């Protein structure tokens, strides 16, 4: 390959120059990073792109790089701000690069200090260009096309590992991004087995961050930091892994975009430097405005609506859009295919069924053709390939024209067969989820060619010691009406271990619709381990033999993302001597732990058991004191009482006396009360100090009380009484899927917000998220409130209040995924009956918004969540306010005194102003349909006052109370103000007015 496209070849050039370029796209996204202890537990010693000496723009440089790196320094660096770096769509803060005057100063100072081999040319206005001298430039910068090709991933195969601190939804999205690259290029991502070089998805302080190209000699990180877990952002980061740099840094960029430096945030100017022509070769590819690697127009901008990069107008006078983060552009695809020398013929097939054929089929294939098809389906599925036509030149050993089918992801995978001639091959099946088909022709013989069809088959027998199983079509939604059965067998004398990375199957308490069934053995009659559905990952599973049976079933309605699980062989650690445990040995994946029977506790050696306080209590009522009561409890005690009542009973605990060491923190001595018998059951409370806890009632028919004391201060302790009472909801939640509400002698089932009760009055189904609200006030909540709202949801609320009233929305709680432009999850509020009405606000984040008031009696809300981050959502109150600006038209409209007209009298202490406005040349006509306002001779208490204009300085048309004006009222002009006042005592029914606009030439205000 004589040349490499500039963006992809650039990292080769940089490697020849620097040896260690890096990209950190925390520059692109303004997110903070919360470092936790969990993040410190990364076991892989990978190359961390966040730990660079300095950054030049998006490039990480070390001390070695600084000696030989050249830049085009075309900006006045003396103007850099000393403030912390950041910008509207993305910040530089995650790098910790808030040092005075910016990290680029460190680079320039080091270059000046080394001196040798550089020329420094002073230009006008204090600007400086730092370049290599001519005698060194030729030797120090060989052409990128042939210098360091080892930075390309061999065969386009990129092994990966996803760190343990990502959720199942995030893992699924990472795989979707990798499959996106695979679909349009010949790059392949595989789960790492024993490869030396691979990438690690991790969560680092620099936010979104990656090296450019293959580092080699071990793992390298691709950091997906806080709020960077978006499909387009991950596709962008993977572009750097493959070899892409930013589009706007190519040498010819000034022919296509204009950098508006006065709009750039102080200290961020160096992010807009461009590369030297001698460092890259663009291969004649046009500038790609649509590239997923291009900065947006307002990146590092002083303000959201100020451009920092302005695209040049095209032939039609239109400025192209830049900065998209949704999919690969045609230019991205073309350049990746050139770098990795993808064959011009063939494609990546990812559907569950498909077909392909030789070029020109059935009219003959050309000579010297090379095509590659890669079939990639869901792990856990197998591929069945069937050739329907075969007509190739036949030669000995199929030397000239042939098709090779390989059982795997690349050209070195095991060969399933090499075919030529006109004999149809047997049906071929893969052992896993990938298949490689390569076609070559080197003869001049003309034949039809070939055609083939394939199908992905879920389930089957698996004889491997480790592997992965996923639901069909994962990470996308599984398909309806599927049934897949896997039979896993590992080596003899081992068990099967199963861990889940992601789990999202349609929720139902009895898993009646979609489910995953797992059995401890080889068939459907083996002991049941569990029926699983919902969104919680099942606990790690371990079989008792070397076989495990799994069945996945989906019905024809709701489809979810499904599951991803790893299986592996496991050794039974408790055998043959019970693990050295005195009483019970509990196998865990990769290890074991000792446990004791109720009434006993582990000794200091963690294997022996000794008598303890606590125990199993099965009476309907009784007393529980601390050890030594009424004297002080001893130090270093751990007591567990397990109270079990009959089915359909609940247990209540009431403390008579309470005195433990500690305060609100409860760090030293404490008592924990849980519903359930295990240490991870639902916690009702952790108590210490001297305040007596309130009465606690269990959810079910058992309760766990655990008391702990440390080795220092001891107090008198506590004395508590427990008693049991029958509860219809305690058995199987009364058969209710969501909530069971006890009533006298019975119970009712209730569903959470966003769900509706099934016809059987027990189950809950996801509801359509469309509500029409006509009540004057009420509560609006996000779906599944107060739990986190679901992903991929769109909900609307259409609020209609009494005509003449304005809808008001007040937020009580608010927590929606944060983004400066609310581009991901958000709530939109419109001033009218639909999303076409004027918008009142687009809301996200955790700050409670100010109340929103519509100009009329209608308001439209739309809530949208994407596929990744979920938050608690929102709860808001809708109500009404009187008054407002009303448009009078020729068709009559209604105006009511208050929102509950007809149901309740008007409120006291009200002051409402309605301004009725007609079109130019028209007047306003009022027709009183109903009028009942407190009567008084001078209308001094409650009254309606009319003004012939837009405010109260206009001529007053009258003040009315009692039964109101006897006839219609007209304005002289285009506006009429109606003022309604009530005092704090008597109130009446109110009024109903119909108003319209009419042509009326006279100045008379009442009808004669």
From Swiss-Prot:
Cofactor: how bound: Binds 1 zinc ion per subunit.
GO molecular function list: calcium ion binding; metalloendopeptidase activity; zinc ion binding
Subcellular location as annotated: Secreted
Major localization class: secreted
Cofactor: Zn(2+)
Gene3D superfamilies: Collagenase (Catalytic Domain) (3.40.390.10), Laminin (2.10.25.10), Spermadhesin, CUB domain (2.60.120.290)
Protein name: Tolloid-like protein 1
